[in-house]
UniProtKB/Swiss-Prot annotation:
ATP-grasp domain residues: 9-247
Pathway: Carbohydrate metabolism; tricarboxylic acid cycle; succinate from succinyl-CoA (ligase route): step 1/1
Protein's recorded name: Succinate--CoA ligase [ADP-forming] subunit beta
EC number: 6.2.1.5
Cofactor binding note: Binds 1 Mg(2+) ion per subunit.
UniProt GO MF annotations: ATP binding; magnesium ion binding; succinate-CoA ligase (ADP-forming) activity; succinate-CoA ligase (GDP-forming) activity
Source species of the chain: Neorickettsia sennetsu (strain ATCC VR-367 / Miyayama) (Ehrlichia sennetsu)
Family statement: Belongs to the succinate/malate CoA ligase beta subunit family.
Pfam families xref list: ATP-grasp_2 (PF08442), Ligase_CoA (PF00549)
Length: 392
């Protein structure tokens, strides 16, 4: 689960990590209230920052440095309600419903600092660079040697030497390392106790007073651990999530919206990814990732079809099911019932394999519906691509 920058910074402040003073503006906030809040903030420089769940805001015009109260108010009004398009949003962009305004900071140096789970090493990776800011992704690609990593064993926990090692590799002075070490340990404690999947400070700045301040913050949390953190779940912003993904979650369907034209319904994450790969191989693009799991019932199958077909970009659907625990005849009955229930008219190709697959194929072929069957995934992918291009 993702949260907004302003929410992440509130958590950081509670943990003792310094952040700039700021306040939130929403669509219904009066101009007079914005002016009063800016006056309380003080200073002559302000950062006006669009709050969306996507990176790349700075380069897309979602972060503006303003040098007067009037300029800050004007840019805030322009941002609210706009669709911000970044390299991490869809081509349509994400509507800005909230703006965060911060006091400007004097910046001597920008750093990058983050923590993620390194699955290969089964440890927490502390990742840092002496070149933080908007170009960190390009730096990681072009000069990977500038990205420093230290791994922390969860069974042992973090020690001063982990933070000091990173600090020395960043070229920090001894005085800076004395401040940097407790900051890193606080972030690690946050990462572990809140079941985070990512903690990112970019940039972490050193200011003219010699202090480290989190100028931007990104926190992601493990969805599977949210039951332990009701306070974190309260921070969820459904406006920032795809409505189809929210609907799919109600039926325990793992759905992720994509930008292609062929809808996919598959059981198993690995098989789903292989299905998307072969669709791309034959020149088309998947419209979604949808894993119905190993024991889908009629309700789940029906709602999976409804969710996929509600996407106006979907021109056809490919169903790829391997029957293990899930019997193919049962899933076939569900496919037929669902297709009839929603009045499915777009091309539908079904590939079944595994337990009772012959019986499943007979059910589909005897349904009287215009459903194309395939015995192999390669054949199924070619058929759905041709059908959506009207080549069959």
């Amino acid at each position: 689960m993702n949260i907004h920058e302003y929410q992440a910074k509130e958590i950081l402040r509670v943990c003792g990590v310094p952040t700039p003073a700021g306040f939130l503006v929403q669509e219904d906030t009066e101009t007079s209230e914005i002016a009063k809040s800016l006056a309380r903030l003080g200073g002559k420089v302000f950062a006006v920052k669009a709050q969306i769940h996507a990176g790349g805001r700075g380069k897309a015009g979602g972060v503006v440095i303003c040098r007067s109260v009037e300029e800050a108010i004007d840019n805030t009004k322009k941002m609210l309600g706009m669709n911000l398009v970044t390299h991490q949003t869809s081509p349509a962009g994400q509507k800005v419903r909230k703006v965060y305004i911060e006091a400007g900071q004097s910046i001597l140096k920008e750093y990058y600092l983050s923590m993620v789970v390194d699955r290969e090493n089964a440890k927490v990776a502390i990742i840092a660079s002496e070149e933080g800011g908007m170009d960190i992704e390009e730096i990681a690609r072009s000069t990977p040697e500038k990205i420093k990593k230290v791994f922390v064993d969860l069974s042992i926990g973090i020690s001063d030497f982990h933070a000091r090692k990173i600090g020395f590799e960043l070229g920090l002075s001894l005085a800076q390392i004395k401040q940097f070490t407790p900051l890193v340990k606080k972030l690690y404690a946050l990462f572990v106790t809140r079941d985070a999947s990512q903690v990112e400070i970019n940039p972490l700045i050193a200011n003219s007073k010699g202090e480290f301040i989190a100028l931007d913050a990104k926190l992601n949390f493990d969805d599977n651990a949210l039951y332990r953190h009701p306070d974190t779940l309260e921070l969820r912003d459904l406006y920032e999530e795809d409505p189809k993904e929210i609907e799919a979650a109600k039926y325990n369907l793992n759905y992720i919206k994509m930008e292609g034209g062929i809808g996919c319904m598959v059981n198993g994450a690995g098989l789903a990814m292989a299905t998307m790969d072969i669709i791309k191989y034959y020149g088309a693009s998947p419209a979604n990732f949808l894993d119905v799991g190993g024991g889908a019932n009629l309700e789940q199958v029906t709602n999976a079809f409804k969710i996929i077909s509600s996407d106006k970009h979907v021109a056809g659907i490919l169903v790829n099911i391997f029957g293990g625990i899930m019997r193919c005849d049962i899933i076939a009955e569900g496919i037929v019932a669902a297709a009839k229930d929603i009045g499915l008219t777009m091309p539908l190709v079904v590939r079944l394999s595994g337990t009772n697959y012959s019986a499943g194929i007979k059910i589909i072929e005897g349904s009287g519906l215009n459903i194309v069957t395939a015995s192999e995934l390669d054949d199924a992918a070619q058929k759905i691509v041709k059908l959506t291009r009207k080549e069959i």
